């Protein structure tokens, strides 16, 4: 692991330890989840770009991304302008997110919602369910193979989908061993935060046809989307370019249509 990811993982362990003290697992697991929505089906339907639109205030590499940050309003705008799913950053320390943002976004949309965070403990999976997540993110670079399989199976037992994220061919091979169709290719290195959207095109050849590739990071223009579609990639996780836009709804529409 690298320094940025190590820092995030170290802090996340401390964060989870505090959460477990405040609300032990036996208490958390008794809370009833709300309505579940089908994340996978939402990405499959029709041929227009399947955009997972992200609610993200800041990042370690870019600092503050959106000053005027109204989670409820952003969720509504994404829903009204053609997003297939939402992604909500819930990491507090590094992304200025919050777990409550996920519950709030879910209450303002009819779309399935992904919890975007750094999962390092099964406690967070139960927490995700209670918050209203329909899908969780597992980052291959953060977990060993036993954790990946255990966490994937637990999430699916709890009726959530799993998006597994890789950045290298080795990580992709590990991701493909998991029983989930959602394969994320992060074009941004978590080692140095450099971005190259060609990575998704390069790694696509190793992904079986029955999987859904979601290209993540660096998708900023209609041309980027057309490039990916020309290589058979039709699902996109897009955050920063939308969050920086003055008119989020228009920006989303511009990405999806000529």
Swiss-Prot record:
Its EC number is 4.1.1.48. It comes from Legionella pneumophila subsp. pneumophila (strain Philadelphia 1 / ATCC 33152 / DSM 7513). Coiled coil: none annotated. Keywords: Amino-acid biosynthesis, Aromatic amino acid biosynthesis, Decarboxylase, Lyase, Tryptophan biosynthesis. One of its GO terms (molecular function) is phosphoribosylanthranilate isomerase activity. One of its GO terms (biological process) is L-tryptophan biosynthetic process. Belongs to the TrpC family. Pfam families: IGPS. This is Indole-3-glycerol phosphate synthase. PANTHER family: INDOLE-3-GLYCEROL-PHOSPHATE SYNTHASE, TRYPTOPHAN BIOSYNTHESIS PROTEIN. It catalyses: 1-(2-carboxyphenylamino)-1-deoxy-D-ribulose 5-phosphate + H(+) = (1S,2R)-1-C-(indol-3-yl)glycerol 3-phosphate + CO2 + H2O. The gene is trpC. Pathway: Amino-acid biosynthesis; L-tryptophan biosynthesis; L-tryptophan from chorismate: step 4/5. Gene3D superfamilies: Aldolase class I (3.20.20.70). The keyword Lyase applies. The keyword Lyase applies.
């Amino acid at each position: 692991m690298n320094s940025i990811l190590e820092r995030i993982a170290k802090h996340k362990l401390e964060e989870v330890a505090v959460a477990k003290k405040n609300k032990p697992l036996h208490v958390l697991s008794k809370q009833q989840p709300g309505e579940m929505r089908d994340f996978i089906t939402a990405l499959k339907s029709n041929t227009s770009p399947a955009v997972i639109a992200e609610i993200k205030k800041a990042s370690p590499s870019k600092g503050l991304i959106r000053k005027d940050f109204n989670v409820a309003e952003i969720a509504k705008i994404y829903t009204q302008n053609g997003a297939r799913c939402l992604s909500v950053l819930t990491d507090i320390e590094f992304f200025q997110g919050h777990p409550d943002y996920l519950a709030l976004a879910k209450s303002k949309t009819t779309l399935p919602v992904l919890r975007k965070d750094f999962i390092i403990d099964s406690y967070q999976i139960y927490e995700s369910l209670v918050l209203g997540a329909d899908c969780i993110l597992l980052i291959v670079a953060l977990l060993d193979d036993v954790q990946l399989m255990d966490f994937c199976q637990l999430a699916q037992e709890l009726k959530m989908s799993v998006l597994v994220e890789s950045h290298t061919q080795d990580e992709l091979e590990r991701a493909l061993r998991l029983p989930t169709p959602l394969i994320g290719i992060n074009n941004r290195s978590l080692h140095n935060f450099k971005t190259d959207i060609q990575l998704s095109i390069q790694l696509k050849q190793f992904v079986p046809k029955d999987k859904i590739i979601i290209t993540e990071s660096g998708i900023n223009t209609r041309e980027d989307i057309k490039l990916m579609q020309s290589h058979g990639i039709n699902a996109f996780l897009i955050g920063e370019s939308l969050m920086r836009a003055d008119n989020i709804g228009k920006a989303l529409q511009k990405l999806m249509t000529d």
